[in-house]
């Protein structure tokens, strides 16, 4: 593949409506990170491009209320030479939950909570020294949809 600074993305998805009120989707994403041009060619250190698997579902509990939930697993193919104190990544899994509340014919309020748990990545510096890269992410969202 040619080198570019933004990786190409391959996506496949399938959705199914089990009932008129219950839907689910399964997705796979592959980012061609090893073919992207990064600073100091650090993409060459990756074991493979990024793999993501996602699953989600929506349930219309009532005419005015829809709830949803989802899961995402991300595997970056990390290696020690890819990680630095300035820029690092960690494999992760995420869980999200949300609700859409239909306020009027034209106005819907959306509320969501999203939590990402990152795997610790340990980079061996020497026989006695190591760096552990770690983080977590929790997001709360609130929004409105207006249909004209």
Model-derived segments and spans:
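Repeated loop/turn-to-beta-strand initiation elements of outer-membrane beta-barrel proteins
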Residues: 21-26, 64-67, 101-111
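Outer-membrane beta-barrel "beta-signal"
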Residues: 99-101, 113, 135-148
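Extracellular loop and loop/strand-boundary signature of outer-membrane beta-barrel proteins
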Residues: 2, 39-44, 80-87, 126-132
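Residues that define the transmembrane beta-barrel architecture of outer-membrane proteins
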Residues: 6-10, 49-53, 91-95, 136-140
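Structural signature of outer-membrane beta-barrel domains
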Residues: 21, 31-35, 74-78, 116-120
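Membrane-embedded beta-strands of outer-membrane beta-barrel proteins
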Residues: 12-14, 26, 55, 97, ...
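Residue-level signature of outer-membrane beta-barrel architecture
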Residues: 16-18, 59, 101, 146
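Transmembrane beta-barrel strands of outer-membrane/channel proteins
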Residues: 26-30, 69-73, 97, 111-115
